[in-house]
From Swiss-Prot:
Protein name in UniProt: Tubulin beta-1 chain
Record keyword Secreted present: no
Cofactor(s) demanded: Mg(2+)
Organism domain of life: Eukaryota
Location of region: Disordered: 425-445
Protein localization: Cytoplasm, Cytoskeleton
Similarity comment text for this entry: Belongs to the tubulin family.
UniProt cross-references to InterPro entries, sorted A to Z: Beta-tubulin_BS, Beta_tubulin, Tub_FtsZ_C, Tubulin, Tubulin/FtsZ-like_C, Tubulin/FtsZ_2-layer-sand-dom, Tubulin/FtsZ_GTPase_sf, Tubulin_C
């Protein structure tokens, strides 16, 4: 029941996705080939959210792996968890998108998209009651951004009433992989604003900072970064995968987190932060977890929530935690830091509990926040976009794939609208209802 179909597109999406499957296989007691060897019934109870049961006590992820070039796929297939996935679910092209959004969205990706949708349909038909889709991708490249957003809109057409969650790696302020990142990201945002229900924004630079500052890793690898992301993804999906006192699912999360349909871009945090090798040496308490998870240095997106206000946020605690303790803690946070929360949404913190902690920890917590400060990211990308677009730099790569300049202009203004919407709600107060009075319907009785 309540299954989720997972898609991973492009190099980044496949690497993050593989780390995620590695993490949750471990939590459910599955080995690298999907055979169950766990100890607790609770690991099995809701395994079918992410896994199909095959013959011989083997579980197969409901995952569709997509890329426009075979390289990353081969790496996944020959990696430690390569035997986990169903071989038919690897869908790849040969040409690559070359960091070009238009190739991913209109030419190369569009040729491959029907094959992917066949696999998605087959996975969806295997579900008793499909809850929704989650996709991991980056917004800066070509495949994850261009083809990823194409898949999202196609799936949206076919399954309009199912949830669509995306884990999107957004371009970071200082670390850039490609020159045309601002173009790709803006074109993707244009799509995500319309077609995604919840987007968890992750950003490499923030992850680097966490690795270096908190985990004291002098030279973090992508493996370390993906380990952090998979911890958050595992945390967000916890209450779907394990029984808990206060369960939430993708839809409940969205209902509690998204006050206005376009504003569905979340910051995420996790506590206690540990590197794969080192585990926490001291007993962690709920106040400490809360402290760490709400610390701006621990946010996995490079924007500081102190520059904005939280519309809503959600916390997921795992392990042996007392419900009352968590609620008191949350209440006190809201009272102490009331300036960081908008006052026109009275109880804007949602809490979920799950009794099973992640592997190697006693208790942990995951934080998801819908903060107006996320506009920093969009504003930054928008400025870089405008700087290049004004000179029409690199545009020929996109127009030669059949794109129109209009589309760039639309994406740019959509992104600017998003920034100003966030700003508008950041400045709104509980009692400035006067400006809307004249629009209120008049009761003629």
């Amino acid at each position: 029941m309540r299954e989720i179909v997972h898609l991973q597109t492009g190099q980044c999406g496949n690497q993050v996705g593989s780390a995620f499957w590695q993490t949750i296989s471990g939590e459910h007691g599955l080995d690298a080939s999907g055979v169950y060897g766990g100890t607790s019934d609770q690991q099995l109870e809701r395994l079918n959210v992410y896994f199909n049961e095959a013959s011989g006590n083997k579980y197969v992820p409901r995952a569709v792996l997509v890329d426009l070039e075979p390289g990353t796929m081969d790496a996944v297939r020959s990696g430690p968890f390569g035997q986990l996935f169903r071989p038919d679910n690897f869908v790849f092209g040969q040409s690559g998108a070359g960091n070009n959004w238009a190739k991913g969205h209109y030419t190369e990706g569009a040729e491959l998209v029907d094959n992917v949708l066949d696999v998605v349909r087959r996975e969806a038909e295997n579900c008793e009651c499909l809850q929704g889709f989650q996709i991991t991708h980056s917004l800066g490249g070509g495949t994850g951004s261009g083809m990823g957003t194409l898949l999202i809109s196609k799936i949206r057409e076919e399954f309009p009433d199912r949830m669509m969650a995306t884990f999107s790696v957004v371009p970071s302020p200082k670390v850039s992989d490609t020159v045309v990142e601002p173009y790709n990201a803006t074109l993707s945002m244009h799509q995500l604003v319309e077609n995604s229900d919840e987007t968890f924004c992750i950003d490499n630079e923030a992850l680097y900072d966490i690795c270096m500052r908190t985990l004291k890793l002098s030279n973090p690898s992508y493996g370390d970064l993906n380990h952090l992301v998979s911890a958050v993804m595992s945390g967000v999906s916890t209450s779907l995968r394990f029984p808990g006192q206060l369960n939430s699912d993708l839809r409940k999360l969205a209902v509690n987190m998204v006050p206005f349909p376009r504003l569905h871009f979340f910051m995420v945090g996790f506590a206690p932060l540990t590197s794969p090798g080192a585990h926490s040496f001291r007993a962690v308490s709920v106040p400490e977890l809360t402290q760490q998870m709400l610390d701006p240095k621990n946010m996995m997106a490079a924007s500081d929530f102190r520059n904005g206000r939280y519309l809503t946020c959600s916390t997921i605690f795992r392990g042996k935690v007392a419900m009352k303790e968590v609620e008191d803690q949350m209440r006190s946070i809201q009272n102490k830091n009331s300036t960081y929360f908008v006052e026109w949404i009275p109880n804007n913190i949602q809490t979920a509990l799950c009794s099973i902690p992640p592997k190697g920890l006693k208790i942990s917590s995951t934080f998801v926040g819908n903060s107006t400060a996320i506009q920093e990211i969009f504003r930054r990308v928008g400025e870089q976009f405008t700087a290049m677009f004004r000179r029409k730099a690199f545009l020929h790569w996109y127009t030669s794939e059949g794109m129109d300049e209009m589309e760039f202009t639309e994406a740019e203004s959509n992104m600017n609208d998003l920034v100003s919407e966030y700003q508008q709600y950041q400045d709104a107060t509980a009692d400035d209802g006067d400006e809307y009075e004249e629009e209120a319907p008049v009761d003629e009785e």
